[in-house]
Amino acid sequence: MLARIQECILYRGFSDGEILNNMAELINLYESDEEALKAKEDQFFKSINGLVELAGMYGFSGNIWHTYLTFLLVNHENAFSMASEIRGAIKGSINDLAKNDFQIFKELYDFDITVFDRVFGTVCCKVICDYQTPDENSKLFNTRIRDRICQMSKTLAAAATTEEFMDDMVSFYKDFGVGKLGLHKAFRIGHDENGKVEIQPITRIAHVKIDDLVGYEIAKKKLIENTEAFVQGRKANNCLLFGDAGTGKSSSIKGILNQYYDQGLRIIEAYKHQFQDLNEVIAQIKNRNYRFIIYMDDLSFEEFEIEYKYLKAVIEGGLEKKPDNVLIYATSNRRNLVRERATDKLEIADDNDLHSSDTVQEKLSLVYRFGVRIYFGKPDKKQFQEIVRTLAARYGVTMPEEELLLKANQWEISHGGLTGRAAQQFIDYIVGTEEEKRK
C-alpha cells in the first residue's frame, strides 16, 4: 500500500499536516525500500513525538495515530465538508472527489504502523496504538470535544468500506459541524500574522447554566424567549442586558450559550476597538450553518468616543441585507449605553451645537437598535439573603443559617453591596474556609 496523500483533491493543505506528510513518506518507503526507511530514523521519532505532544495538548487517548487522522478530517473546511454541514448527504460530482480522498485516508487507517517497531527496534508504535494520556484535562479542547473526536476515530477505524467511511464523515459534519466553528462554543476576534481578521476559539468556557442565576425570573424568561426564537430560525431581536454591576448579566449570556450550543448557537466576543472588524467577521460567518451572537460585555461610550457610530452601522446594515443567523447581544451598566449630561435633558443648546436635540437623539439611537432590553437590578436585603441561602445549599455549606446570614450581611458592606456577585464571592469564601478547617 502506498500513502497517496498527494493525490487528495479536497483534503489538502492541512494546518497540522506535518506529521501526516512525514508518516506518509515512511509508509511509502516501507513498501518500496526498507533500507532507505532505516535512514529516516530521526523523521520517525519526530513523528511519534508529534503525536504524543498532540495527544497531551488535546487530551487524546487510545490509538492516537487514528485520532490524529480524525482530527485532521473533522477540522478541514472544504467544499464537501461545509456542504455536508448544512445539508448532510449531498448530490453531484463532488461526492466522487470526496470518495477519492476518503479512500486514501481509509488506507492510512488500515495500515498497521506497528511494523515500524521492527524496523527501528522500538515499541513506540505499539504504545501509541493504545495510548493512555497522563492528564485527561485538555489544554485546547474541553472533554466534550475530545470525547467526540476519540469516538469518531474508533468509528472510522471500524468502517468496512470507503462508502461506510464516507457516510460516517458526512453524519459527523451534519450532526456536529466542521472546523473550529463546529467544534467550539465561543470565539474572540483576532488577526493572523498577515493582519487578516480571523475568528479564534476560546477553549476554556465556564460551565454556567442559566438556572444557576438565583432570582431574576422575568429577566431570564425574556432572554430565553428571544434566544430560543433565534436558534429555531424565527424572528428575534438584538438584546441589551443593562443594570447594576454584579447582578448576573454576563453570567446569563454564558448560561444561554451552554444551554443552546447543541442547537447550533455560537458566541463571538467583541470589544469596542474591534468594531471596525465586525463587517469582516460577519462575512466569514453569514453562510455557516450556525446561529451567531456577537457579544459585547460591559458596553458603554464616553462623550468623546465615536465607535458607537460604527456599531450602529453594523447593526442597521448597509445595502447588503443583515444575515438572519447573526444577532448582537450586549451587557452594560448604562441604560442608554452613551454617557448623558444633565444638559441633554434640557432644551438648552450647546454653544458649539446648533442642533442639540439632534445630538441627543443620535446618542440615544444606538440603544434603540436593541429590540429587547432587559433590566437587571440589585436585589433588596430579603432577596440577597435568599440568594445566599440558595447558594449555600447548592455548595453544601454547613454553617447555621443565622450565623451564615449575619456574616453575609457583613460581607456585602465591604464587597460591593447587595449583589448576586457579592453573594457568590461570600459563599466561595465560606466553602474555602470550611474545606481548610476539615484538613
Segments and roles (model prediction):
Residues N238-A270, E280-N287:
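Walker A/P-loop
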Residues T133-I199:
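Interdomain "pre-motor" coupling segment immediately N-terminal to P-loop NTPase/helicase cores
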Residues A349-L364, G371-Q385:
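Conserved AAA+ ATPase "SRH/arginine-finger" region at the nucleotide-binding site
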